[in-house]
């Protein structure tokens, strides 16, 4: 029953599960229960290691030590839970992993999240390519590593990264250099702050997404002859190069911090909207 709250001895739960689930040990069950449990502590604001003090702040989203991620309560030798909250936890954690926002220090989990995030990014890029093709006004060239046999790199030979989507509006004589990112929606001020830093703020040698994007746009402008040669566009003097940043969800920090950077969400993508970009 989803509405029931269950209270059972820890040892009884382990015994029941080992008897009813094949190829599972008491050690594995214990590790799982410990990973999704909350225990009593002398000071509510003090969490056991390796958790951070921020993991107890109720206004923070995606806390490693929250009831959303730890729906079981341990009390002495008993555990208390509800099936509905357990199911919610599975959906919630799966969503965090898929969105690449699951906080973990486990190397294997971090590697898995990175792999899933990369795949999600590729799928999003493919979807944007489909939308641009469906508009019917563009010549679309995804995932460009080289232009006219020249690598996209700076004067020192250091790579500037691939161009996610290069597309051409022949009737308007425009070449668009598009960066695509499947960022999750920022749900609170802290996530907005992280989004702002990742998107717009350079930190030493680590450059933000906008800076990297601008460098690729500049490369295309400096190699316009190569672009026109490879894409058979004719006279370079007729063409202008436009940068475009396409995201899955609106970048709220762009408005909050009054940055006015030209960013288009997937839902906005249309011929009219694209042609408004300068």
Short names for language-model regions:
Residues 1-278:
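Intrinsically disordered, low-complexity Ser/Thr/Pro/Gly-rich regulatory segments
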């Amino acid at each position: 029953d989803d509405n029931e709250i269950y209270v059972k001895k820890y040892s009884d739960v382990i015994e029941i599960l080992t008897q009813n689930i094949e190829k599972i040990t008491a050690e594995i069950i214990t590790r799982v229960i410990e990973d999704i449990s909350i225990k009593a502590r002398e000071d509510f604001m003090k969490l056991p290691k390796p958790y951070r003090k921020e993991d107890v702040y109720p206004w923070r989203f995606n806390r490693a030590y929250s009831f959303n991620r730890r729906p079981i309560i341990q009390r002495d030798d008993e555990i208390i839970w509800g099936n509905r909250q357990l199911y919610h936890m599975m959906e919630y954690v799966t969503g965090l992993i898929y969105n690449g926002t699951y906080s973990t220090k486990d190397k294997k989990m971090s590697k898995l999240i990175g792999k899933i995030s990369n795949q999600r990014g590729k799928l999003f890029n493919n979807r944007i390519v489909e939308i641009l093709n469906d508009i019917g006004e563009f010549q679309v060239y995804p995932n460009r590593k080289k232009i006219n046999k020249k690598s996209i790199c700076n004067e020192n030979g250091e790579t500037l990264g691939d161009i996610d989507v290069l597309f051409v509006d022949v009737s308007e004589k425009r070449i668009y250099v598009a960066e695509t990112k499947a960022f999750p929606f920022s749900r609170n001020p802290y996530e907005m702050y992280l989004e702002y830093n990742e998107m717009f703020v350079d930190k030493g040698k680590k450059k933000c997404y906008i800076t990297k994007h601008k460098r690729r746009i500049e490369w295309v402008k400096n190699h316009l002859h190569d672009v026109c040669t490879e894409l058979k566009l004719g006279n370079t003097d007729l063409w202008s190069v436009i940068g475009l940043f396409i995201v899955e969800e609106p970048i709220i920090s762009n408005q909050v911090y009054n940055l006015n950077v030209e960013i288009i969400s997937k839902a906005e993508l249309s011929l009219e909207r694209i042609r408004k970009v300068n």
